[in-house]
Amino acid sequence: MDNNLTLAVKELAYRLGADLVGIANIERFENAPIKMSPKGILPTAKSVVVCAVHHPDAAIELDGEIHPQELGPYRIQYIMNDKLDVLSFKIGRMLDDLGYQAVPIASSNIWRYRGYKDMDAVFAPDMSHIYAGVCAGLGELGWNGLCITPEYGAR
């Protein structure tokens, strides 16, 4: 992605409420399992835009064993996923309007759009947002299997 386009994408993402934004070159996904690769969705992909929204610390720290029908403090996750979905859609539309192919990916989706090569399963994640965050330079893969960022740590 050229520098002007990178700046425009990041500017839009931050304006829409992203806390972190990174852009990964598709080569960073070269050895990723096909179920976690952007090439499984858009074989001609060259870059992957990754946005993150910070979870309020208290919503994570105060959540715990509660009644199974109570959502508790972590229910903020629904709002955050919606925010990430809007970010994905609007960035995808911007890229589409500029003549690029873009496939906005839902923040918590488990359905594929189509099979890919020898993988015909449709009940699988579109790709790993965790790996995408690492590939885009937002953080490192932690022992907990999550993308650990310098700004927000392992909380």
Language model region names:
Residues 32, 73-155:
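Catalytic cores of enzyme domains
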